């Protein structure tokens, strides 16, 4: 991707190239929530926090509801969204209004950072699909564009199925396959002369 081709990547996945060896981002898929002339913000969607679930968060925050539906599973993993503000929650979900701090990312996805959404989890008021993350990934002005030029990432249009339903260990390759790339066939030295 050349510099003059880079446009707004909101509602795209960044798929780490095999050459990216930083343990925070190796084989990661980042969902871009915001991208503008001041930088970019995204959530890693395939790096779960070990032994940490949505249920764990609700218990730790002492959030209970009398409307809790026992048939709704709360054992979903919590993801390490990135190295920034990793003590703060970010919830990607299918559109649903009524929360204190939500932003529409696309017609299929919103992000909410207010605690009131946590009170709906496991109840009939919960958004249809959710992905809970601690922390986020951020890029300053021009930083993401430079990383794309350097082939650190490939950018692909986001897919709600991958975001919410694809098994975690398949997301890296599944996201790349959106544009016909099989990451398992790529060498970690790709792009080096």
Swiss-Prot record:
One protein family per Pfam: DUF179
This protein's GO CC annotations: cytosol
UniProt xrefs under InterPro entries: AlgH-like (IPR003774)
NCBIfam families, per the entry: PRK00228.1-1
Family the UniProt entry places it in: Belongs to the UPF0301 (AlgH) family.
Protein name in UniProt: UPF0301 protein Bfl251
Organism: Blochmanniella floridana
Biological classification of the source: Bacteria, Pseudomonadati, Pseudomonadota, Gammaproteobacteria, Enterobacterales
């Amino acid at each position: 991707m050349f510099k003059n081709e880079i446009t707004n990547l909101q509602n795209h996945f960044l798929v780490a190239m095999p050459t990216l060896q930083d343990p925070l981002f190796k084989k990661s898929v980042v969902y871009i929530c915001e991208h503008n002339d001041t930088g970019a913000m995204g959530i890693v969607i395939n790096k779960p926090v070990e032994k940490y679930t949505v249920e764990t968060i609700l218990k730790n925050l002492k959030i209970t509801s009398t409307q809790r539906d026992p048939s709704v599973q709360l054992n979903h993993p919590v993801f390490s969204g990135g190295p920034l503000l990793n003590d703060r929650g970010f919830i990607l979900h299918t559109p649903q209004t009524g929360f204190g701090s939500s932003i529409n990312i696309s017609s299929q996805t919103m992000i909410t950072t207010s605690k009131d959404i946590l009170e709906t989890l496991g109840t009939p008021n919960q958004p249809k699909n959710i992905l809970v993350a601690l922390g986020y990934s951020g890029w300053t002005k021009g930083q993401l564009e430079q990383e794309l030029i350097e082939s650190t990432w490939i950018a692909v249009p986001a897919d709600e199925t991958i975001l919410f339903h694809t098994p975690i260990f398949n997301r890296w390759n599944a996201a790349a396959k959106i544009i016909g790339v099989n990451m398992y066939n790529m060498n970690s030295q790709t792009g080096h002369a």
